[in-house]
Amino acid sequence: MSSISIWTERWFLSTNAKDIGVLYLIFALFSGLLGTAFSVLIRMELSGPGVQYIADNQLYNAIITAHAILMIFFMVMPALIGGFGNFLLPLLVGGPDMAFPRLNNISFWLLPPSLLLLVFSACIEGGAGTGWTIYPPLSGVQSHSGPSVDLAIFALHLSGVSSLLGSINFITTIVNMRTPGIRLHKLALFGWAVVITAVLLLLSLPVLAGAITMLLTDRNFNTSFFETAGGGDPILFQHLFWFFGHPEVYILIIPGFGIISTTISAYSNKSVFGYIGMVYAMMSIGILGFIVWSHHMYTVGLDVDTRAYFTAATLIIAVPTGIKIFSWLATCYGGSIRLTPSMLFALGFVFMFTIGGLSGVVLANASLDIAFHDTYYVVAHFHYVLSMGAVFAMFSGWYHWVPKILGLNYNMVLSKAQFWLLFIGVNLTFFPQHFLGLQGMPRRISDYPDAFSGWNLISSFGSIVSVVASWLFLYIVYIQLVQGEYAGRYPWSIPQFYTDSLRALLNRSYPSLEWSISSPPKPHSFVSLPLQSSSFFLSFFRLSSYGEQKEISGRQN
């Protein structure tokens, strides 16, 4: 068998969860770079009043649509759920692979054609200038007569099918493939985050599929679901879309919660504070996420009682979110904190997610949101939660687990520099947008009065700093692959804290199962079923011995 056919079979016909996870991460990196390029175009256009680079407002809106859909469906979800989820979940539960390995492969390979459809949609005719929300009548056939919106709908359908298949796989794996000793209440928090996310996807995506299919038939088959002339109602689309759209933002952030819990615990050198509380907080956030969707729609003419209910329900979400924030702070408190790149990103996440949550409390109030709706205040709010929440969680997870994924260490100094560059860049970009929103600058408009030019210039400068940080990240990955030194099984262990006691040594060494196997893991991770004892968190399996642990920790020193 030739090396080319072996390579093709490994990467194109793979049924190995670890290889598929790596494919997801590569795909997310590519999509993220594409989405970042679109975001820089937006910020360059807004760097000054009047026309800068993009004379056509339709093109500007098409860029905004492409940026949003790329970042949400093709960057954050494939990285956090597809990438880290696939690679780590079988290791965390002690299983050999995912429950349905071939289903896993098809759920990845649906994404590249979906991405192509989205890119075609942006390039054909004037592009889909609807925003990611694709509201009718703007997305209707009168306003967008070409095939752009249809292609965007097909792209969403394909990525939705991919996510649904992945969700079924994750739920089945967690329920059926846990090794003896890992009860649900001993599962790593990242495992809980993935299964909660999978349930949310399973419940919300069919609603989106129904809404965009109805829009497709309105556009092409003369139905009138959202056409007032035929007895339809465009507000129905908003209800259907946001019934999916609000759980979607929790789908994006809950895996991040799991990663941050893992990394803060690892680099504070103590267990997560309030494990059970953390699990139930994530569950509560997931459930409450389904009953608050109309807070996106305060300005469409909802009844005053309806607005009062959605304000109250939205504010209640702050309670489980606050539990998580304070539990992370309590985990840090009294711990032996090491400011590794992963820990820096985790602390950055906590800081900026808190700021995003505070502006969310403001927007939850119907009376205030009447003023803030569709201004840059909203843009600042959700970018603090996503651009600095989900993305910082991705980097935290990457720097924590990449020695396990690649088996190579990375440059600590450069990766800390990347954190500070990105931290400064995103704050410079999005903090001024709060002020622009308070002054009433509307979203999705490519021109603005001269009075807004100062804060916009600072915001655009911040986006350039963020892009430099992204280039630095690519360079860090490059030198890791070319010059990286071998990483042991658990490169984050602290040898000076070891005692002569075997139990203490092993307790220190492996906070969860994935660190008990080689770096990078073999295609079939566990030769025999690992056993998790109730007294300490460790897997015993063939080839594992005390001598090997001492040899590995000695090699790290």
Swiss-Prot record:
Top-rank taxon, per record: Eukaryota
Known catalytic reactions: 4 Fe(II)-[cytochrome c] + O2 + 8 H(+)(in) = 4 Fe(III)-[cytochrome c] + 2 H2O + 4 H(+)(out)
Binding site for heme a3: 381
Cofactor note: Binds 2 heme A groups non-covalently per subunit. Binds a copper B center.
Cofactor(s) it depends on: heme; Cu cation
Topology feature Mitochondrial matrix, residues: 1-20, 94-102, 177-188, 269-274, 333-340, 406-411, 480-557
A GO CC term assigned to this protein in UniProt: respiratory chain complex IV
Function as written in the Swiss-Prot or TrEMBL entry: Component of the cytochrome c oxidase, the last enzyme in the mitochondrial electron transport chain which drives oxidative phosphorylation. The respiratory chain contains 3 multisubunit complexes succinate dehydrogenase (complex II, CII), ubiquinol-cytochrome c oxidoreductase (cytochrome b-c1 complex, complex III, CIII) and cytochrome c oxidase (complex IV, CIV), that cooperate to transfer electrons derived from NADH and succinate to molecular oxygen, creating an electrochemical gradient over the inner membrane that drives transmembrane transport and the ATP synthase.
Binding site for Fe(II)-heme a: 67, 383
Mitochondrial intermembrane side: 46-59, 124-147, 221-233, 301-303, 364-375, 437-454
Subcellular location: Mitochondrion inner membrane
Gene that specifies this protein: cox-1
Topological relation to the membrane, as annotated: Multi-pass membrane protein
Subunit structure comment from the entry: Component of the cytochrome c oxidase (complex IV, CIV), a multisubunit enzyme composed of 11 subunits. The complex is composed of a catalytic core of 3 subunits Cox1, Cox2 and Cox3, encoded in the mitochondrial DNA, and 8 supernumerary subunits Cox4, Cox5a/Cox5, Cox6, Cox7, Cox8, Cox7a/Cox9, Cox6b/Cox12 and Cox6a/Cox13, which are encoded in the nuclear genome.
Positions of transmembrane segments: 21-45, 60-93, 103-123, 148-176, 189-220, 234-268, 275-300, 304-332, 341-363, 376-405, 412-436, 455-479
The protein, known as: Cytochrome c oxidase subunit 1
Principal place of residence: mitochondrion
Keyword Transmembrane: yes
Pfam families with a match to the protein in the record: COX1 (PF00115)
Keywords: Calcium, Copper, Electron transport, Heme, Iron, Lipoprotein, Magnesium, Membrane, Metal-binding, Mitochondrion, Mitochondrion inner membrane, Myristate, Respiratory chain, Translocase, Transmembrane, Transmembrane helix, Transport
InterPro entries named among the record's database cross-references: Cyt_c_oxase-like_su1_dom (IPR023616), Cyt_c_oxase-like_su1_sf (IPR036927), Cyt_C_Oxase_1 (IPR000883), Cyt_c_Oxase_su1_BS (IPR023615), Cyt_c_oxase_su1_dom (IPR033944)
Residues binding O2: 250
